[in-house]
Amino acid sequence: MAKLREASFCALACVLVLFLSFVSADTYNRQDKQVYVVYMGSLPSQPDYKPTSDHISILQQVTGESSMEGRLVRSYKKSFNGFSARLTESERKRVAEMEGVVSVFPSKKYKLHTTASWDFMGLKEGKNTKRNLAVESDTIVGVFDTGISPESESFSGKGFGPPPKKWKGVCKGGKNFTCNNKLIGARDYTNEGTRDIEGHGTHTASTAAGNVVENTSFYGIGNGTARGGVPDSRIAAYKVCSGAGCSSEYILSAFDDAIADGVDVISASLGGDTAYMYEKDPIAIGAFHAMAKGILTVQSAGNNGPNPTVSVAPWILTVAASTTNRRIVTKVVLGNGKTLVGQSVNAFDLKGKQYPLVYETSVEKCNNESLTTLALSFLTLTPQSNEQIISMFHTLIMWSPKATILKSEAIFNQTDPKVAGFSSRGPNTIAVDILKPDITAPGVEILAAYSPLVSPSATTLDNRRVNYTITSGTSMACPHVSGVAAYIKTFHPEWYPSMIQSAIMTTAWPMNPSGTDAVSTEFAYGSGHIDPIAAINPGLVYELGKSDHIAFLCGLNYNATTLKLIAGEAVTCTGKTLPRNLNYPSMSAKLSKSKSSFTVTFNRTVTNVGTSNSTYKSKVVINHGSKLKVKVSPSVLSMKSVNEKQSFTVSVSGNDLNPKLPSSANLIWSDGTHNVRSPIVVYTDYASSVDIF
C-alpha cells in the first residue's frame, strides 16, 4: 500500500511539473497581458462609422498584429463607444494616447452581494393591490447576474402574450436554452451560456419579477407563495457573473446591450470590494448612460457591513438589506436537556438523535469522514444565549457532550424591520455630501427560485437540489426595489429615473436606530424602509436630469477631461453645483471637525405630481436627541397645477457635533394626503480612513 502511495505521489508530481511548465510558457507568451477597458464615450453621429472596425484598427496600430484573435474581448457599439482588449502595460499607454480614446482602465472583478417579503411591504397579491396590468405586461426588468434557470416555474411563459413591441433584444442563452414570452431575452458574456449554475441570478430575477407560484418552500420551511413585485412584467437576463466573479468588461457590455434592448429597469446585485471614483467604475459609467436614456439602475449596497457601501453614485438607487416580520430559527437541544435558540436555516431532521458537539477550535482533530456527515449542521446563536454559550464552552473542555439540532421553523412577530449586520453602511466615501445607502428593503431569509444545478449550500459535499431556497444578502434586497421601481413605472411610464427614485425614497417608512453608534443611523438605512403602495402616489418629487448630474460632478471639481470619462462626450462646466445642493431627495453635509458652531444650507426644488390647487406645509422632526435647529423657507408651498415646480431652502445650524454620531432630522412636506419626507444628516469625520481607487 505504501509503495502504491509513493507511485501515485511520483506520478502526481510529474504531472504537476509538466503543468507548471506549460503555465510558465503560457505566461511568457502572454507577456503579462491583462484585460483593459477602452472607453471612447458616446457613439459618433456619422452614419458610416463602424465601431468594431475602428476598435480593430486601433489595436492593430498599437500591437502591430494583423489578427486580433485573443486580443479583442468585447466591442461596445450600441449605447456608447469602446472595447475591451488584452494589452500589455506599454500597449495600454499607447492606446490611452490615441485620438478618440477617453480613458483606459483595467478590468476589475466584482462580487455578487449574496415570499412573505412582498406581503410584509404591503404589496399583496389579489384585488386589494392596485395594478395596471396592461402596462405591467409591457414593462421589462433587466437583471445583471449569474444568468437564469429558464425552466423554472417562476419564469414560465404560460398566459403571456408576445413581447412588447419596444423590445429590441435577443435570446442568446446558449445550448438547450429557450426563452419564452415571460423570459424574453438572454445574453451571456462569460462564455458559459446564460443558464444559471450558481443560483444567485435565478433567485434575484424571481424576486424582482417572478411569476406567482403557490406552495413553495425550502423543505417545508417558509411555505407559501413565491412571486416577484411585478409578476406580469417581462424579464431579460444578462449573465455578467460566473463563479470567478463579475468582470468590468462584461458589466459594460451588458449596459451597452440592455440600453439598446429597451429594458425599463436594471437590477444589479453586485459590486466591488470598495468604492471607486466614478470615472473608474464601470457600473457608475454604464448607469450614467442608462440614466441619460431614461433607465433607472438599482444596485445592492454590499455585504461588508459595517464598512462603507460600494454603490455611491447619485444616479444609482442604492439598497440596504433589512429583516421582515418573519424569522427562521433553529433550536439546539443539549444532552442535559437545555435548549439554545439560534438563527439559521436547517432543513435536516435528525429525529432527535444526538451527535458529538465539537467546539470550533477542535475541528482540526476530527477525521474527514466524521466532518463530512456533519458539515452542514451549524447555526449562529443569538446574543441572548451568551451565558449558556459560556457554560457550554466549559462543558466542552471537560466532557464530550452531545446535542441534536432541530429542523428550522418560521416564526412571525410584529417587531420593526432592522438593518442586517452584513449590510454595508454610509457615509459616502466619494461624494461625502450625498447620503448612501438610499433605501432599505427585505434582504434576510428571502424565499425565491433557485437553480437545480447547484446545491443550496453551494458546497460540493451537498448533493441536494432544490427549485426554491432561502438566502440573505443585499443581493436579495436589491431586486425588491427593482420590482417596486418597475411597479411605479407601470403607473407613470413617462417618469424619469430620478422621479421614480424620489418617489421610493420620500415615501419610505421611517426607521429607528438599532443601536447607539453611527452605523445604526441613516448611514444604515438611508431614507427608511421601502413602501411600494405609497410610492406610486408621492405627491411631490425631486427631479434630476443629465445636466444636473454634470453640474454636480463639476462641484466635485471634475473638469472637461474627467467629465468626458463619465458622460462620454465633450462637456464643460458652465456652472457648478455644491454637491449638497444636488436636487436629491435626501440632504446630507459633512462638516469640519474644527467648527464648534455651524450653519449649512440646502437648496431644493420639488415638482407637483399630485393634484392641482394643493398646499404643502413643512414640518421638521429632530431625531436621535440631536440639538439641531432647522429652518425651512418658505415654509408653505402652494401648487396651483400639476407639474408645477417650486423651490425652497433648508438652513441647519447647531453646535459641537458629536464626532462619533451624525446629527439628523426629517423634513416633511404634507398636504394632508401626502407626506413627502426627506432625511437631513450632518456629520463630521468620525469614520476611519477608507482607501479609494
From Swiss-Prot:
EC number annotated for this UniProt entry: 3.4.21.-
Keyword annotations from UniProtKB, A to Z: Autocatalytic cleavage, Glycoprotein, Hydrolase, Protease, Secreted, Serine protease, Signal, Zymogen
One Pfam family matching this protein: fn3_6
Ranges of residues in domain PA: 354-396
Propeptide span(s): 26-113
Keyword Cell inner membrane: no
PTM comment text: The C-terminal propeptide is autocleaved.
InterPro entries: Peptidase_S8/S53_dom, Peptidase_S8/S53_dom_sf, Peptidase_S8_Ser-AS, Peptidase_S8_subtilisin-rel, Peptidases_S8_3, S8pro/Inhibitor_I9, S8pro/Inhibitor_I9_sf, SBT
Matches recorded under CDD domains: Peptidases_S8_3
A molecular-function term among this protein's GO annotations: serine-type endopeptidase activity
Glycosylation sites: N176, N215, N223, N368, N413, N467, N559, N603, N613
BP GO terms, sorted: proteolysis
Residues annotated as domain Peptidase S8: 117-536
Domain Inhibitor I9 as annotated: residue spans: 35-113
GO cellular component, one term: extracellular region
Residues of the signal peptide: 1-25
Enzyme class: hydrolase
Active site positions: D145, H200, S475
Subcellular location(s) of the protein: Secreted
Domain of life: Eukaryota
UniProt-listed PROSITE patterns: SUBTILASE (PS51892), SUBTILASE_SER (PS00138)
Entry similarity comment: Belongs to the peptidase S8 family.
Name this polypeptide is given: Subtilisin-like protease SBT4.10
Organism of provenance: Arabidopsis thaliana (Mouse-ear cress)
Lineage: Eukaryota, Viridiplantae, Streptophyta, Embryophyta, Tracheophyta
